[in-house]
Regions:
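Signal peptide-proximal N-terminal region
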Residues: 30, 37-63
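Extracytoplasmic ligand/sensor domains, especially the bilobed periplasmic-binding protein
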Residues: 87-174, 253-255
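Sec-dependent signal peptide cleavage junction
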Residues: 1-17
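Extracellular/periplasmic periplasmic-binding protein-like sensory domains
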Residues: 229-305
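Hinge/beta->alpha junction and helix N-cap segments in small-molecule ligand-binding domains
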Residues: 65-71, 113-115, 129-136, 159-171, ...
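Short, well-structured alpha-helical segments in soluble
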Residues: 70-84, 198-207
Length: 370
């Protein structure tokens, strides 16, 4: 969705945009790989964005698409000297080559795929579309501290399962340090194995509301605590109190009973992506994808078709306004973009982060974009 639309067709000057996409489409292979199938969905989503943008603005769009697996990568790269921006592939080595070329020729390069790519640090014009882990942790911790600093804040409780993988121990340690600095008291509840309602009620009076902090993002660990937390939430609700359970980006992938329990336990987690499957823009875009390509986009996190759509719609909106980077946040169907330049970094990085919060009884979570 063009939530940041400026001029309309009636008063917009016609602009010319030259965009290159370099994707592993495997057009010469007898059988498509999973990577090429996802790249094709991305490409198809991007084409839908071009179509939608073209219906709103009279700009001229020259889109060049290169298959990075066809053996002509070096020659294709050398032909990009006059494009406005390059969308880079899911390939570390090729991104490095593209970065050297685009940095030398002052061409923005848009990384839609590799979360941990760091070429933006040392290369001008590189655009890393994924918020970095350090910044993501900092923003999530800021949000938790702000929540727990309110006058009527719930009491924080850290769950410490002796048999937990504790894959988020680093995050929890940082959060505890911050809570200590802010003078926010918290309780640590130790247990071993499955977390039962009785363990919670024996240690936490139901006369208060609680903010539970977990130490793992894994589904297997979540399954050890979800049922007990859901039952405990009912006990709290009977006395007019609430339960919030803080979790992690992996929780966005939960399906079935695990997903159903997110609302029951008052789940709150952060993520680089979020799709409102019942949203009008989502349904419209998925329907258009089906109409044009005869099938639904492949499911995944992120959905590659929507990633392609959001990437291209952002790029076209920015180029329409005269730059590769917008001077304000942009909220798409699945991704949000708010590129920033930080000291010591030659390129730019997306600073947007979703906070997803489930409330018991609500049909869908509330979403905040930081």
């Amino acid at each position: 969705p063009d939530t940041n639309a400026g001029e309309t067709c009636d008063n917009a000057a016609i602009r010319h945009h030259r965009i290159a996409m370099m994707l592993p489409l495997c057009t010469t292979a007898e059988k498509a790989s999973r990577q090429s199938a996802l790249a094709t969905d991305f490409y198809r989503g991007a084409l839908l964005a071009v179509k939608d943008f073209g219906e709103a603005y009279p700009d001229s769009i020259d889109l060049k698409v290169y298959d990075t697996t066809d053996g002509n990568f070096s020659n294709n790269l050398a032909s990009l000297h006059n494009v406005d921006i390059v969308i880079t592939p899911d390939d570390d080595a090729k991104i490095a080559q593209i970065a050297r070329y685009t940095g030398t020729h002052s061409i923005p390069a848009f990384n839609s795929f590799i979360v941990k790519d760091s070429t933006y640090i040392t290369t001008p014009y590189m655009m890393q579309t994924y918020i970095g882990q350090e910044r993501m942790y900092a923003k999530a911790i800021d949000y938790v501290v702000e929540t727990l600093s309110a006058t009527d804040a719930p009491k924080p409780v850290i769950l410490d399962n002796a048999n937990d993988r504790k894959d988020k121990l680093n995050f929890v340690s940082r959060l505890k340090e911050r809570l200590d600095r802010e003078g926010i008291e918290y309780t640590t509840l130790e247990f071993d194995g499955n977390l039962h309602k009785t363990i919670l009620e024996d240690n936490l009076p139901t006369s208060a509301s609680y903010f539970i902090i977990t130490m793992s993002g894994h589904l297997s660990e979540y399954n050890k605590i979800a049922s007990g937390l859901a039952a405990f939430a009912e006990s709290l609700a009977a006395e007019g109190n609430t339960l919030t359970t803080f979790g992690y980006p992996e929780w966005i992938s939960f399906r079935g009973d695990a997903q159903d329990k997110l609302a029951q336990i008052g789940a709150l987690y952060y993520s680089r992506f979020y799709v409102d499957k019942d949203g009008e823009d989502t349904k419209r875009t998925i329907a258009e994808f089906r109409r044009w390509y005869g099938k639904a986009p492949a499911d995944g996190i992120p959905v590659q078709a929507l990633l392609g759509y959001d990437s291209m719609r952002y790029i076209l909106t920015a180029l329409h306004e005269g730059n590769a980077i917008l001077d304000r946040p942009y909220h798409g169907i699945q991704s949000s973009y708010n590129f920033v330049h930080t000291p010591g970094i030659k390129g730019s990085i997306n600073d947007a982060l979703y906070i997803i919060r489930y409330i018991a009884g609500a049909t869908s979570p509330s979403v905040t974009i930081l």
